[in-house]
Design a protein with these regions (language model features):
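Extended, charged alpha/beta regions that create polyanion-binding interfaces
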Residues: 59-167
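Solvent-exposed alpha-helices and their adjacent loops that cap or buttress functional pockets
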Residues: 7-11, 29, 83-86, 126-128, ...
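Residue-level recognition of short, solvent-exposed, well-ordered loop/turn junctions
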Residues: 32, 38, 123, 127-130, ...
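Short glycine/threonine-rich loop/turn motifs
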Residues: 179, 206-339
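Flexible, glycine/charged-enriched surface loops at secondary-structure junctions
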Residues: 55-56, 81-86, 144-146, 204-208, ...
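C-terminal terminal segments
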Residues: 29, 85, 100-119, 126-129, ...
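Glycine-rich phosphate/diphosphate-binding loop of Rossmann-like nucleotide-binding domains
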Residues: 158-213, 217
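Short, low-complexity N-terminal leaders and the immediately following helix N-cap/first helix
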Residues: 1-88
Length: 342
């Protein structure tokens, strides 16, 4: 830091805020710390009584916070993301369309472990709407050594650590099982709930079949739905451990790869996820809670399925932390802790 005549300050970086006071109008910073002085600024600074300024001594090996923020932004920004103008060394990213926000946690941790810089984001695997804020970046000091930003540039060269996956239009088949529905003892109130949730992501039910508790019929129905071009199959009913509940066996007998039967999520513990064939078409067994609980495991899984984002058994297991829905009177999901473990 050094003192310099204001008339010679063009191109220099301010070390402190410069306050402008106009009685009855304003008392606020006219120029912020970190501002790069321009020729046009000099008359204004002089009118504020600033004949001398404290400025940073620029060095060839130093980067201003705005320049460093650009490097951090490049490490983050991907297709479908808009960025703000750099302001006081900070850049924010926002979603240009609805989609599934993804983040490479390992590379994010690498950057934030370097010191003197930070990237803060919303949770990954979160559905977002157009215009939602995604992340912000900045360095901590006003200037930083260029060599400290080199690891960030290397990470950026590997590709952005964030992505925004678009939802795909999908055709869904719903297979309702249960003697009580098949024989007309009760009304099917499950399918309308599924239909509403699918509409939110642009999916349509193109086939709906009601079957008794017979695993062979359910297996045949799943395979036929796949032959008809279903891009996901949702099986409702028959997912618990009662003798009449045969849906898990029916899905297994299709030859699909069972990723998990059961998940550490409440509501939703009896959920089943499988993928069929080389196209990895998702088949799901939905527990009864999906019908009556406001948010369940289905609300965590569906955005990823709609974005063609494969789910592993390990990821499902990681949902245990944060997998307990508190059933708040006013639901704020996804802006809450539910389902943020993966």
């Amino acid at each position: 830091m050094k003192q310099i005549e204001t008339k010679k300050a063009a191109g220099m970086v301010l070390c402190h805020d410069i306050t402008q006071i106009i009685r009855g109008v304003t008392k606020d910073a006219r120029f912020r710390k970190g501002h790069i002085v321009t020729e046009e600024d000099i008359p204004v600074l002089l009118s504020l009584g600033k004949d001398h300024l404290y400025v940073w001594e620029a060095g060839e090996n130093m980067l201003h916070e705005n320049d460093a923020a650009e490097i951090l932004c490049r490490a983050c920004q991907n297709a479908g993301m808009s960025r703000s103008e750099v302001k006081e060394g900070k850049i924010e990213l926002s979603a240009e369309h609805d989609g599934l926000f993804k983040i490479d946690k390992e590379r994010l941790l690498r950057i934030n472990s370097l010191g003197q810089m930070m990237i803060a984001s919303r949770h990954g695997n979160t559905p977002v709407k157009k215009g939602d804020k995604l992340a912000g970046t900045r360095i901590i000091p006003l200037v930083i050594e260029k060599e400290k930003m080199e690891p960030v540039e290397q990470i950026a060269n590997e590709g952005p650590i964030m992505s925004l996956l678009s939802y795909q239009t999908k055709k869904a088949a719903v297979i309702t099982t249960g003697n009580e529905v098949y024989f007309g003892r009760i009304k099917d109130t499950f399918t309308p709930v599924i239909e509403e949730k699918l509409k939110e992501y642009g999916a349509n039910i193109t086939e709906h079949i009601v079957l008794p508790d017979d695993h062979t019929q359910v297996t045949r129905a799943v395979l036929k739905a796949l032959e008809h071009g279903a891009q996901m199959v949702l099986c409702t009913g028959g997912m618990s451990v009662d003798p009449d509940d045969q849906t898990p066996l029916a899905i297994k007998n299709t030859g699909a790869e069972i990723i998990s039967y059961g998940a550490p999520v409440l509501p939703g513990a009896m959920f089943l996820l499988a993928y069929y064939g080389k196209d990895r078409i998702p088949i799901m067994g939905l527990p009864g809670c999906v019908m009556y609980s406001q948010k369940t495991i289905f609300d965590l899984i569906l955005p990823r399925v709609m974005a063609d984002d494969p789910i592993t058994a390990r990821e499902l297991a990681s949902l245990g932390e944060g997998g307990f829905c508190l059933g708040c009177e006013v639901c704020t999901y996804p802006n809450c802790g539910f389902g943020k473990g993966w």
